[in-house]
Amino acid sequence: MLTEDPVSEICEAKAVDELAEQEKNYYCQRCLNHGELKPRKGHKPDCRYLKCPCRECTMVEQRRQLNNLLSKKKIHCTPATQTRDGKRVRDPHCARCSAHGVLVPLRGHKRTMCQFVTCECTLCTLVEHRRNLMAAQIKLRRSQQKSRDGKEPKRNSRRKSKDMDMEMMVVTATDGQKIIGTSASPSPSSTTDTMSPSLSMSPPCSPSPLLAQYTLTLAAPIPIYPPIPMNQQLISLQQQQFLMSIIQNMAPSIGQQAPLLPGISAGSVSSAAILNEFWSMYLKNYGLQA
């Protein structure tokens, strides 16, 4: 009794073979630079980007020219071909050694062990130039493959999945709170995602009236004025006030004649006369003299 259908196994084997054949298809590199998948076999005469002057297509042409130069100038030697199941097995050799007619398998052949690693001949210069060009093309092909497959960097995908998990937790918590409705459940404000667009785009809150009142009643800074220069009129006014205070001390009553100072001697009568004259001038100026 058969447990599996042999027809389905045959169909699966054919599908695997067809998939393997599709994976082995080679496409035109110039068309790949412009986002088109065109099989390379027999496509060169009909390629619309055959003379494209862009940087990527220029690298393709430079590599073709370098391969032609190396094939014409290097010493040809026929390596022993190996076959497996009727197909040739790829057995790469060191490019620098092959340019000088020496066949050394590339596997296990480090650059420090190569005898032509410091050679600066024309062939080795072409080999190094082609190596750098191939590295740039491989980097370009990988980026193109990632863009075609729609792959994103792992960091972005992890962050995206983490954000989705957080959103699911928030939705689950809010739904459970609505169903249970207990006071021990967390509040919606605590379960809301702080990075949601509604919160990030909220307008700024208006200031409270109390804060505005305090802001309006703030004391102004004390002004500092420059010193006023003393003019002659102010000086004379101060002298008159000082003289008036002296005369008032000497003569308390207005109608009484100003007496001589008790401490003035006979030899200093002139000083008393001057003070009496000042007193009379004071009374005359202010209209107090009869």
From Swiss-Prot:
Residues 139-167, 179-202 are annotated as: Disordered. Residues 182-202 have a biased composition (Low complexity). It is found in: Nucleus. Residues 28-74, 94-142 bind DNA. The keyword Translocase does not apply. One of its GO terms (cellular component) is nucleus. Expression is undetectable in hermaphrodites, but persists in males. In males, expressed in cells of the tail tip. Induction: Negatively regulated by lin-41 which causes degradation of the mRNA encoding this protein. GO terms for biological process: cell differentiation; negative regulation of transcription by RNA polymerase II; nematode male tail tip morphogenesis; positive regulation of nematode male tail tip morphogenesis; positive regulation of transcription by RNA polymerase II; regulation of transcription by RNA polymerase II; sex differentiation. Its main location: nucleus. Keywords: Developmental protein, Differentiation, DNA-binding, Metal-binding, Nucleus, Repeat, Sexual differentiation, Zinc. Residues 146-155 have a biased composition (Basic and acidic residues). InterPro entries: DM_DNA-bd (IPR001275), DM_DNA-bd_sf (IPR036407), DMRT (IPR026607). GO terms for molecular function: DNA-binding transcription factor activity, RNA polymerase II-specific; metal ion binding; RNA polymerase II cis-regulatory region sequence-specific DNA binding; RNA polymerase II transcription regulatory region sequence-specific DNA binding. Pfam families: DM. Transcription factor which binds the DNA motif 5'-[CGA][TCA][TA]ACAATGT[AT][TGA]C-3', probably as a monomer. Acts partially redundantly with the transcription factor dmd-3 to coordinate tail tip cell fusion and retraction and thereby regulate male tail tip morphogenesis. Promotes male-specific development of two tissues, the peripheral nervous system and the intestine. In the peripheral nervous system, directs differentiation of sensory ray neuroblasts into peripheral sense organs. In the intestine, causes repression of vitellogenin gene transcription. This is Protein male abnormal 3. It comes from Caenorhabditis elegans.
